Design a protein with these regions (language model features):
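Catalytic-domain carbohydrate-binding cleft regions of carbohydrate-active enzymes
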Residues: 1-170
Length: 170
């Protein structure tokens, strides 16, 4: 959807660093003396991959769905799917279309890959930044309408997305 066109890239470490620098750091510079006492934490509300077409129900296998991707992911995907990098690359159309006998393994490996990147480059990064400054990282990962296990409005893997948070909120 159009409201996500300038949204952060959850898989990209640099993108998350920019978000911290531009949003979190100015708060710390201005209100640092209140961190850990008046300010108890930072709250993120429904962070997501934002790659959906407009429905909560978008899943892998929709031909027009844009998927989070970085070139280095092919090696990660191959390892998780127990394939060579060349095999994994040839099977990439299986993220959108059925590939006889290979679709499930490829899609599972893809979801594992992007949700680990989300955890490492978003949730843990923000959580570490907060704890280093004496505040909690509190967040609400959307879980309704089955988005807890999807991209789009979701974070791919509900519990992995919580990894890095000190507590959940609503």
């Amino acid at each position: 959807p159009a409201h996500f066109k300038n949204y952060i890239d959850m898989c990209d470490e640099e993108s998350c660093h920019v978000m911290i620098k531009e949003i979190y750091e100015p708060h710390y510079e201005r209100f640092g003396k209140y961190f850990g006492n008046t300010f108890r934490g930072f709250f993120s509300d429904e962070p997501c991959f934002a790659n959906n077409i407009g429905s909560y129900y978008d899943t892998l296998g929709i031909p027009s769905l844009i998927l989070p991707w970085r070139n280095y992911m092919i090696e990660m995907l191959a390892k998780r799917a127990d394939l060579s990098a060349e095999e994994a690359e040839l099977l990439l159309p299986g993220l959108w279309y059925e590939v006889s006998g290979k679709t499930s393994r490829l899609r599972y490996a893809y979801m594992e890959t992007v949700t680990h990147l989300y955890r490492d480059n978003f949730s843990r990064m923000i959580g570490n930044w907060c704890r280093e400054r004496g505040v909690l990282y509190i967040g609400h990962v959307i879980e309704d309408m089955n988005t807890h296990m999807r991209l789009g409005y979701g974070s791919g893997h509900f519990f992995r997305a919580l990894d890095g948070q000190d507590m959940s909120g609503i």
